[in-house]
């Protein structure tokens, strides 16, 4: 939602068809309605780019240039009909229209490699990136606006690949993460934006790996480059949490509370079973995603019991559509708090004899599958 002084917005929507039905009315409505149109158009273009990403560079960039020209026509038409429009909204609208295309152009090399038979990057000449001449990567006011931040993220990854890294297949190497952090430090000027990208990178790469093995060099680089005490403290908590549950050691018992509000022992709940303990909070995962993901994992790996444990939860906050008997929460007195100081979600995989097989897996990462497969078969 875009608001300026004296705006007064009302919105209407149908919850069964959320995005397509969202309409604004009132002062400032036209601005927000065209931004919604940009979002919906971008959703359609995502599907088209699955095909475009397989094209040779010349044909791909021709598609991008053609679509960009249409976006600029839309932009010019809007300004012609709104001659008194503010410069601030003009910048937002131009970003909403064009930056998703620029972001896809930045991501094209890795997507092309993914679909090509050789698995290699395409050969690109310098003119491929001519659109960069129209872009500033240090617009601090836009850094949390998704069309802009996604472009910057893709650009930073592209610049890091250009240092000679091969296409990433599953997990980012320690060296790639290290170099990406250095690229962020070099390219991003604003301290707040730089710190945000540094933290997002080191944490997301650790989670993507979905392993309790810590790569020291990227974390050391993060601590060297970040100037945010708050971010440093949080990342250190994640590191400490990871070290607190050790692979190939027996899971330490801790108390959980069920939804009859009774205190239970986790080792008794999972005794003799292969188990995935998923610690969650609503800041990171919505309930509908958790329900869908648990159902998918249960169907794929049926020999595992899936236990959901809400961090700092309460007995009223159940997740619908999954078995309430496997849902628990912990309060501030639970022994589990010793390895959840960051309050970040995590999965702990435990085998039938109570031994930890993975102490810090990511619920949403594709890379958790290899660990679940082994656990399911033993």
Give short role names for the model-derived ranges.
Residues 319-353:
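Short, internal strand/loop/helix patches
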Residues 264-294, 307:
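Short active-site neighborhood of thiol/selenol oxidoreductases, capturing the structured segment around
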Residues 232-267:
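N-terminal "domain-start" segment that seeds a small globular fold
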Residues 169-200, 204, 208, 212-241, ...:
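Charge-dense, extended regions
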Residues 352-378:
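Thiol-/selenol-based redox modules, centered on thioredoxin-like
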Residues 48-179, 183:
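N-terminal, charged low-complexity regulatory/assembly segments
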Residues 1-84:
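A non-transmembrane, solvent-exposed segment enriched in polar/low-complexity residues
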């Amino acid at each position: 939602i875009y608001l300026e002084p004296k705006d007064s917005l009302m919105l209407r929507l149908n919850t069964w068809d959320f995005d397509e039905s969202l309409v604004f009315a009132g002062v400032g409505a036209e601005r927000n309605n065209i931004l919604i149109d940009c979002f919906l158009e971008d959703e359609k273009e995502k599907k088209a780019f699955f095909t475009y990403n397989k094209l040779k560079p010349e044909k791909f960039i021709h598609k991008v240039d053609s679509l960009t020209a249409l976006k600029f026509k839309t932009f010019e038409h809007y300004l012609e009909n709104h001659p008194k429009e503010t410069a601030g909204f003009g910048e937002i609208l131009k970003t909403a229209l064009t930056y998703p295309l620029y972001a896809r152009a930045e991501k094209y090399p890795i997507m092309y490699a993914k679909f090509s038979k050789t698995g290699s990057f395409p050969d690109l000449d310098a003119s491929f990136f001519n659109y960069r001449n129209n872009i500033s990567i240090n617009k601090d006011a836009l850094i949390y606006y998704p069309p802009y931040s996604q472009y910057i993220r893709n650009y930073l990854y592209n610049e890091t690949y250009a240092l000679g890294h091969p296409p990433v297949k599953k997990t980012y190497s320690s060296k790639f993460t290290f170099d990406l952090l250095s690229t962020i430090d070099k390219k991003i000027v604003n301290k707040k934006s730089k710190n945000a990208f540094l933290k997002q990178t080191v944490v997301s790469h650790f989670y993507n790996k979905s392993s309790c093995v810590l790569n020291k060099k990227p974390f050391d680089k993060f601590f060297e480059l970040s100037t945010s005490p708050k971010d440093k403290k949080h990342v250190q908590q994640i590191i400490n949490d990871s070290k607190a549950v050790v692979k190939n050691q027996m899971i330490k018992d801790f108390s959980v509370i069920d939804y009859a509000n009774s205190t239970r022992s986790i080792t008794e709940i999972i005794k003799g079973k292969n188990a995935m303990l998923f610690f969650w909070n609503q800041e990171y995962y919505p309930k509908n995603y958790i329900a869908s993901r648990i159902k998918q994992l249960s169907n794929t790996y049926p020999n595992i019991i899936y236990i959901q444990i809400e961090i700092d939860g309460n007995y009223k906050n159940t997740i619908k559509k999954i078995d309430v008997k496997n849902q628990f929460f912990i309060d501030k007195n639970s022994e589990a708090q010793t390895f959840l100081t960051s309050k970040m979600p995590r999965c702990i995989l435990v085998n039938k004899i109570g031994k930890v097989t993975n102490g810090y897996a990511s619920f949403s990462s594709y890379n958790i599958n290899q660990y679940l497969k082994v656990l399911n078969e033993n």
